[in-house]
Curated annotation (Swiss-Prot):
The keyword Oxidoreductase does not apply. Pfam families: MutS_I, MutS_II, MutS_III, MutS_IV, MutS_V. This is DNA mismatch repair protein MutS. It comes from Alcanivorax borkumensis (strain ATCC 700651 / DSM 11573 / NCIMB 13689 / SK2). GO terms for molecular function: ATP binding; ATP-dependent DNA damage sensor activity; damaged DNA binding; mismatched DNA binding.
Length: 859
C-alpha cells in the first residue's frame, strides 16, 4: 500500500483511512451484502479462513488483493478468527447510499477481539472468556482480569515469575495485554492473543482517574485499595475494553481485589499435574472438573471451574458450603432444584449483552424464562439458615417478568432487524402500522364499500398506481355527483380520480407502514433494553447467586451418586487423615473396582517415603491425597470413607517432567526448577508431593539430591510430604529423622509376571520389579532374558551392605581413601575387567549402586 492516497480511488482512500486507525486488526469493510478485506488483510484472511483470494481492479497502479465473506455468515468467520487469536474491526455503512455523492460513509462500529467478545456465537458456553492485563515493576506484577460478558473485574498483585505463571495458568486469558516495554516469563509473551500496548496506557495516575470515573467514586479505598501496579494493569485493561466496545461499560460497577491469603496457593506445575480442568494432553474429559460438573447452567459450569482453581482457606465460607450441600442432600432437595435450574439460561452473559446493548431478541425470551423460574427455584430450597442469604440474593423480579412477557413474542426471530419481535398489544402505534401493512387490501375494500354506501355511486372504485398512489375513481357520468370532501387528483377521458382525507391518511401510512413499523420496533426494543438495564445490578447479583446454587446442587448430586462424604475441617490441629480414600477421576474411568487406601499425617508423622514398582499406584495415591485435600478446601464432599483435613496454605507437586524445548530446559532442569520452587516456598502448612526426584542425572547425584530434599522438607520445613522414590536408600530416613515413616505399594509375582495389588502398606518395598514392568511394556524377550542373567550375576557378587547415609556424604573423604592414579599402559586389572561387563543403560538405580559397592570391594 502506498502512503499517497491521491493515487487511490475515493472508496479505497476511505478504506485506507480506516485501516490506518486499526493497523493491528483485520478490517471487515462492508460493501452491500459482503464484508470485504483488502491488501494484507485479504491475504491473511484467505490463509486463515480458507477463502478465495481475488483481485479488485487496481489502485496506485497495482492489483488490489481482495477476499470477502457474506454479511449473513460473518459470525461463523469471526468465531474462527477469534479462536486463532485475531482481532477484527467491523466497518459498517452508516450513510444512505441513495443520498451519497461519493463513497457511502462508513465507520468502525465495533472491534471484536478474543478477550472482549460477548456474542453468544463467539463464546464457549461453559468456559470463562477473560481479558487480562499484566504490568511489571521490579518483578512486582500487577494483574487485572475482566470477564466482559459477565461484568466480573478482578485485580491482584503477585511477586516473581513463579507466582505470575501460576496466576496466568489459573486465569487462562483469551487475550493478554502487556506493556511494550516489558516482556513476560515463559510462553505468555509470544502466545496468540498477547497484545503489546503503549506504556503510557499503564500510567498509574491516569488509570486511577479512569477507574474512579467508571465506578463513580472519589477513590478506590472502598474496593480494598489495590496496589499501584494492579491499578496500572486495571486502567490499561478498562481503557482497552472501552476502545473495543466503542462505548461505555455500564455493567462494570466495581472491582474485586483478590488476596492470596484467602486461597490455597497452587503453582502452574501443580495445576497441570493434578489435571484440574485439563489433562496433560489438553483434554477436558477425565479431569477433576469433569467429574464434579453435573451443573445445569452454563454460568454454573464456569463458576465450578473457578472454584476448582481457587480452593479457599476461609473456614466460615467452607463451613457454609458444607452445610448447604448437606441440606440439599436431605430429602434429595438438590433434584428438585436441578429440575428448575434446567429452565434457567445463561443469565450472566445475557445481562452482559443487555448492558452493552447488544442483546438479541432470543436473549430476552431466555431472560424472561429464567426470571419466571426464580420463585419456584426458591421454593425447592430447604428451610435452613444457611440458605437465607442466598435466597435474598436470588430475589424475585415480577415487574421484569411482566414487562418481558408482554413486550416480546414467545419465539422471536434471531435479529431485531428481521422485525416481528415486539408482541401484539405492547404498542398501539406498532399494532396499527402492522395492521396497515398486513391488511392493506382488506382496508381498501372496506373503504370502497363504505364510500359506495355513502355516495350511492355505482362506478366508485378504490385503486392504486405507483405514480398517483391511492385514489377513488368515478366514471365521467357520475363524477359530477362526487361529495365535496373529494379532491380532484387526475382527469381522464372517461373517468375522474379523487382523493379523500381518509384515503390520504391511509396512503401516508400504507406506503411507509412496513419501514415505519420496523423503525418503531427498533426504538421500542432499545427502550426495552433500557428498562431491563435499570435493574441491572440486582439482576447480576441474582445471576451470580443462581450460579452458586447450581454448583452446590451439582456437588450434592455428585456426592450422592459417587458415595462421597463430607470431610471434617480441623482448625486447631495439623492433620491429613483419610480413611479408604479414592482417586476421584481414576475411579470413574476404571473398568475394575478401585482399591481404596488410607493416609494419616499429623505433627508426629509429617512425611511418608513411598516405594514400590512402577505402575504400582504411587502417583495415583499421591494425587488422590492432593485432590481430596483440595476438594475439602472447596467445601465439597470427598471420595473416602471419612476424612479429617487441617488448614493448608499451599499444595505443591513435583510429578513427572518433560523437556521444555521452547525454554531451552532439559527434563532435569525442569525437575530441579520445580523442586527449587517447593523448597523455597513450602511451609509447615503445605502439602507437598514429590515423585522420583533425581531421575534425570547420574545415580549418585540423583540419590544425593533426593536425600537432601527429603531431609530439608522433614527437618526444616516440616511440610506434609508424600515422597515417592526408587532410591531404596531413602527408606533409611525414618531411622535418622523423626516424623518420617515408610510405605509401599504392594505387588506379587506369578509365573514370572507381576500382579499389581495397589494396596498401600507401611514399611519399605522389598524389590522394584523392574524387569517385570519392562516385560509388560513390551521390551523384547531376548533383552528381558539377558537382563535377568545380568541381574542374577550382580546379585551373586555379594555387594557390601549399603551405608546408613547417602553415597554423597557431606563428610570429605580421608586422604587414605583416595584412589591411586592408574597408569594408561597397565594391563587391565580386576576393576577394569568388571566394568567391561557393565552396561549402565540397563541398570536400575539399585543395581547401579550395588555394582559400585562390588567395584569398591575389588580395590
Amino acid at each position: 500500500m502506498t502512503a499517497d492516497l491521491s493515487q487511490h480511488t475515493p472508496m479505497m482512500q476511505q478504506y485506507l483511512g480506516i485501516k490506518a486507525e486499526h493497523p493491528d486488526q483485520l478490517v471487515f469493510y462492508r460493501m452491500g451484502d459482503f464484508y470485504e478485506l483488502f491488501f494484507g488483510d485479504a491475504q491473511k484472511a484467505a490463509r486463515l479462513l480458507d477463502i478465495t483470494l481475488t483481485q479488485r481492479g487496481q489502485s496506485a497502479g497495482k492489483p488490489i488483493p481482495m477476499a470477502g465473506i457474506p454479511y449473513h455468515a460473518a459470525e461463523n468467520y469471526l468465531a474462527r478468527l477469534v479462536k486463532l487469536g485475531e482481532s477484527v474491526a467491523i466497518a459498517e455503512q452508516i450513510g444512505d447510499p441513495a443520498l451519497a455523492k461519493g463513497p457511502v460513509e462508513r465507520k468502525v462500529v465495533r472491534i471484536v477481539t478474543p478477550g472482549t467478545v460477548s456474542d453468544e456465537a463467539l463464546l464457549e458456553e461453559r468456559r470463562d472468556n477473560l481479558l487480562c492485563a499484566v504490568f511489571d515493576h521490579n518483578n512486582q506484577y500487577g494483574c487485572a482480569s475482566l470477564d466482559l460478558a459477565a461484568g466480573r473485574f478482578l485485580v491482584t498483585q503477585v511477586e516473581g515469575a513463579e507466582q505470575l505463571q501460576a496466576l496466568l495458568e489459573r486465569w487462562s486469558p483469551a487475550e493478554l495485554l502487556i506493556s511494550e516495554e516489558h516482556g513476560l516469563p515463559g510462553r505468555w509473551s509470544d502466545r496468540p492473543g498477547t497484545r503489546k500496548r503503549p506504556s503510557w496506557e499503564f500510567d498509574e495516575d491516569a488509570a486511577r482517574r479512569q477507574l474512579c470515573q467508571q465506578f463513580q467514586v472519589q477513590d478506590l479505598a472502598g474496593f480494598g485499595e489495590p496496589s499501584p501496579v494492579a491499578v496500572s494493569a486495571a486502567g490499561a485493561l478498562l481503557g482497552y475494553a472501552k476502545e473495543t466496545q466503542r462505548g461505555e461499560l455500564p455493567h462494570i460497577t466495581g472491582l474485586t481485589v483478590e488476596s492470596f491469603d484467602d486461597a490455597v496457593a497452587m503453582d502452574a506445575a501443580t495445576r497441570r499435574n493434578l489435571e484440574l480442568t485439563e489433562t496433560l494432553d489438553g483434554q477436558e474429559q477425565h479431569t477433576l472438573a469433569w467429574v464434579l460438573d453435573s451443573t445445569k447452567t452454563a454460568m454454573g459450569a464456569r463458576l465450578l471451574k473457578r472454584w476448582v482453581h481457587q480452593p479457599l482457606r476461609n473456614r466460615t465460607t467452607l463451613t457454609q458450603r458444607q452445610d448447604q450441600i448437606d441440606a440439599l442432600r436431605q430429602g434429595w432437595c438438590f433434584e428438585s432444584a436441578r429440575d428448575v435450574l434446567n429452565d434457567i439460561g445463561d443469565m450472566e452473559r445475557i445481562l452482559g449483552r443487555v448492558a452493552l446493548r447488544s442483546a438479541r431478541p432470543r436473549d430476552l425470551t431466555r431472560l424472561h424464562a429464567s426470571l419466571k423460574a426464580l420463585p419456584p427455584l426458591i421454593g425447592t430450597l430447604p428451610a435452613a439458615d444457611c440458605f437465607c442469604e442466598l435466597i435474598e440474593r436470588i430475589g424475585q423480579f415480577p415487574n421484569q417478568v411482566e414487562l418481558l412477557g408482554t413486550a416480546v413474542i414467545e419465539n422471536p426471530p434471531m435479529l431485531i432487524r428481521d422485525g416481528g419481535v415486539i408482541a401484539p398489544g405492547y404498542s398501539e402505534e406498532l399494532d396499527e402500522l402492522r395492521s396497515i401493512s398486513e391488511n392493506a387490501g382488506a382496508i381498501l375494500v372496506d373503504i370502497e364499500t363504505r364510500e359506495r354506501e355513502r355516495t350511492q355511486l355505482s362506478t366508485l372504485r378504490v385503486k392504486y398506481n405507483r405514480v398517483h398512489g391511492y385514489y377513488i375513481e368515478l366514471s365521467r357520468r357520475e363524477s359530477d355527483q362526487a361529495p365535496t370532501d373529494y379532491q380532484r387528483r387526475q382527469t381522464l377521458k372517461n373517468a375522474e380520480r379523487f382523493i379523500t382525507p381518509e384515503l390520504k391518511e391511509f396512503e401516508d401510512k400504507a406506503l411507509s407502514a412496513s419501514s415505519k413499523a420496523l423503525a418503531l420496533e427498533k426504538r421500542l426494543y432499545e427502550a426495552l433494553l433500557e428498562k431491563v438495564a435499570a435493574d441491572l445490578h440486582a439482576l447480576q447479583r441474582s445471576a451470580a447467586a443462581v450460579a452458586e446454587l447450581d454448583v452446590l446442587a451439582s456437588l450434592a448430586e455428585r456426592a450422592e451418586a459417587l458415595n462421597w462424604v463430607l470431610p471434617q475441617l480441623v482448625d486447631d490441629e495439623a492433620i491429613i487423615e483419610i480413611v479408604d480414600g479414592r482417586h476421584p477421576v481414576v475411579e470413574q474411568v476404571l473398568d475394575d473396582a478401585f482399591v481404596p487406601n488410607s493416609l494419616h499425617l499429623d505433627n508426629a508423622r509429617r512425611m511418608v517415603i513411598i516405594t514400590g514398582p512402577n505402575m504400582g499406584g504411587k502417583s495415583t495415591y499421591m494425587r488422590q491425597t492432593a485432590l481430596i485435600a483440595l476438594l475439602a478446601h472447596l467445601g465439597s464432599c470427598v471420595p473416602a470413607a471419612s476424612a479429617r483435613i487441617g488448614s493448608l496454605d499451599r499444595i505443591f507437586t513435583r510429578i513427572g517432567s518433560s523437556d521444555d524445548l521452547a525454554g531451552g530446559r532439559s527434563t532435569f532442569m525442569v525437575e530441579m526448577s520445580e523442586t527449587a520452587n517447593i523448597l523455597n516456598n513450602a511451609t509447615a502448612q503445605s502439602l507437598v508431593l514429590m515423585d522420583e526426584i533425581g531421575r534425570g542425572t547420574s545415580t549418585f547425584d540423583g540419590l544425593s539430591l533426593a536425600w537432601a530434599a527429603a531431609e530439608h522438607l522433614a527437618r526444616n520445613l516440616k511440610s506434609f510430604t508424600l515422597f515417592a522414590t526408587h532410591y531404596f536408600e531413602l527408606t533409611q530416613l525414618p531411622e535418622q529423622l523423626p516424623g518420617i515413616y515408610n510405605a509401599h505399594l504392594t505387588a506379587s509375582e506369578h509365573d514370572n509376571r507381576i500382579v499389581f495389588l495397589h494396596r498401600v502398606q507401611e514399611g519399605p518395598a522389598s524389590r522394584s520389579y523392574g524387569l517385570q514392568v519392562a516385560q509388560l511394556a513390551g521390551v523384547p524377550s531376548s533383552v528381558i532374558h539377558r537382563a535377568g542373567e545380568k541381574l542374577r550375576e550382580l546379585e551373586q557378587s555379594k555387594p557390601l551392605a549399603p551405608s546408613a547415609t547417602p553415597p554423597s556424604s557431606y563428610a570429605a573423604p580421608s586422604p587414605a581413601a583416595a584412589p591411586a592414579q592408574a597408569s594408561l599402559f597397565n594391563e587391565p586389572n580386576a576393576i577394569e575387567l568388571a566394568l567391561t561387563d557393565l552396561d549402565p543403560d540397563e541398570l536400575t538405580p539399585k543395581q547401579a549402586l550395588e555394582a559400585l559397592y562390588t567395584l569398591k570391594k575389588l580395590t
